[in-house]
């Protein structure tokens, strides 16, 4: 039996691709040059790109594709529809008009320099931009933290220098998250050379980088909350000075003469370790520093402290230990609870500016144990800005 012969069906015509428009870039401020390209338009003909009330001509290729350059008009705002058309064929895409970022205020040349630490560190440029606008000046130093497992922070230091600031690197000899007892990081293990290869790597990298960097090694050593404090983690009296000198010598041997060594205890308090036994000596330190916070009534154990009450006793001890050595307030901020943070900000800058050997302060602009940020309230931000402006004018 013959099989039935089925009629041959014609293949359906290929669907014509819909016209498409592409923008590069897709966002930017007015005046931006934008490449508009398209496919699926009428072939080998002229067309028009419409941008608001402006028009730009183009010619399509034999494939129906085109590419042309346009400029975003000065009056454009927000989402801007860009349409390309050839006779009856048209397609659109949306360009987002952004506002140009305001120019950042410059770094002040005042004798009392302003620095900052932020949650995101040196690579979080938006945070640092915000601080510059809040303060009315850009920070002259940016404080950030590295533990003893991290590589030399060249990328972060480059970001700080690009802002016209000096990196203030807090180098912590422990493993973050490991707790107070970390025998591998005991001070005598550092002095014995267990970390010499790592310390040398840092020194060589800093020397090769070659630009000014402040190195704050093993800070707040007079407290009991870090494993490099004496009396914890197996550390004995005298171990801290030996470890500091060893790290200093290893780094210095690499030729890292661009490093400024910052010795930075906490403000002395009842029960803290005496500073005299922790000071490595003037030949091992370039800057002496203090960390101190006004906790106000934000904690059960704390009370409001004026800037002078907070810092004057420690500054007096630093002057006695290291006469003529510059003094830095390496971390400070105030809580809101318990008093007027706005007034505290004003008093801080006024008090520090009156101390001829205090070369700067670094504000801890973080929301952590409490809201330490400059703009924890509008009143705080306004007072901070005004205080810096007054010291610039003096």
Predicted ranges, named:
Residues 155-172, 287-336:
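Glycoside hydrolase catalytic-domain groove-lining segments
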Residues 99-150:
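Boundary/entry segment of secreted carbohydrate-active catalytic domains
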Residues 108-119, 325-394:
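Substrate-binding cleft of secreted/luminal carbohydrate-active enzymes
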Residues 119-126, 143-158, 175-178, 189-198, ...:
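Acidic-and-aromatic substrate-binding clefts and catalytic sites of carbohydrate-active enzymes
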Residues 155-263, 384:
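Substrate-binding cleft of extracellular glycoside hydrolase catalytic domains
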Residues 244, 248-274, 324-337, 360-366:
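Aromatic-lined carbohydrate-recognition surfaces of secreted/lumenal glycan-active proteins
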Residues 128-137, 151-169, 201-210, 278-283, ...:
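Acidic (Asp/Glu)-rich catalytic clusters
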Residues 1-101:
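Extracytoplasmic/secretory-pathway segments with low complexity and glycosylation-like composition
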């Amino acid at each position: 039996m013959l099989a039935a012969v089925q009629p041959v069906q014609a293949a359906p015509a290929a669907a014509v691709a819909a016209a498409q428009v592409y923008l590069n870039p897709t966002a930017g401020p007015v005046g931006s040059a934008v490449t508009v390209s398209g496919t699926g338009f009428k072939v080998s003909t002229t067309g028009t790109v419409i941008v608001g009330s402006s028009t730009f001509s183009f010619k399509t290729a034999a494939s129906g594709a085109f590419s042309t350059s346009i400029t975003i008009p000065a009056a454009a705002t927000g989402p801007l529809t860009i349409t390309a058309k050839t006779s009856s064929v048209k397609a659109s895409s949306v360009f987002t008009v952004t506002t140009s970022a305001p120019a950042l205020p410059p770094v002040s040349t005042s004798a009392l320099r302003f620095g900052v630490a932020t949650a995101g560190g040196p690579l979080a440029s938006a945070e640092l931009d915000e601080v510059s606008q809040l303060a009315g000046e850009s920070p002259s130093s940016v404080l950030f933290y590295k533990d003893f497992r991290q590589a030399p922070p060249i990328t972060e230091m480059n970001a700080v220098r690009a802002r016209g600031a000096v990196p203030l690197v807090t180098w912590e000899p422990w493993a973050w998250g490991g707790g107070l007892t970390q025998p591998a990081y005991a001070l005598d293990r550092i002095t014995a050379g267990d970390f010499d290869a790592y310390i040398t790597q840092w020194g060589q990298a800093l020397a090769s980088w070659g630009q000014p960097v402040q190195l704050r090694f093993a800070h707040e050593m007079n407290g009991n909350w870090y494993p490099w404090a004496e009396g914890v983690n197996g550390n004995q009296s005298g171990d801290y000075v030996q470890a500091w000198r060893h790290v200093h010598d290893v780094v210095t041997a690499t030729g890292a003469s661009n490093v400024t060594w910052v010795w930075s205890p906490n403000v002395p308090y009842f029960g803290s370790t005496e500073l005299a036994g922790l000071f490595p000596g003037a030949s091992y330190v370039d800057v002496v520093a203090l960390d101190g916070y006004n906790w106000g009534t934000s904690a059960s154990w704390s009370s409001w402290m004026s800037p002078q009450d907070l810092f004057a006793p420690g500054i007096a001890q630093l002057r006695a230990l290291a006469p003529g050595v510059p003094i830095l307030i390496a971390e400070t901020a105030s809580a809101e609870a318990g008093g007027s943070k706005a007034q505290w900000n004003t008093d801080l800058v006024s008090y520090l500016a009156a101390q001829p050997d205090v070369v700067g302060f670094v504000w801890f602009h973080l929301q952590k144990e409490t809201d330490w940020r400059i703009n924890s309230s509008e009143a705080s931000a306004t007072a901070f800005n005004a205080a810096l402006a007054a010291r610039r004018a003096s």
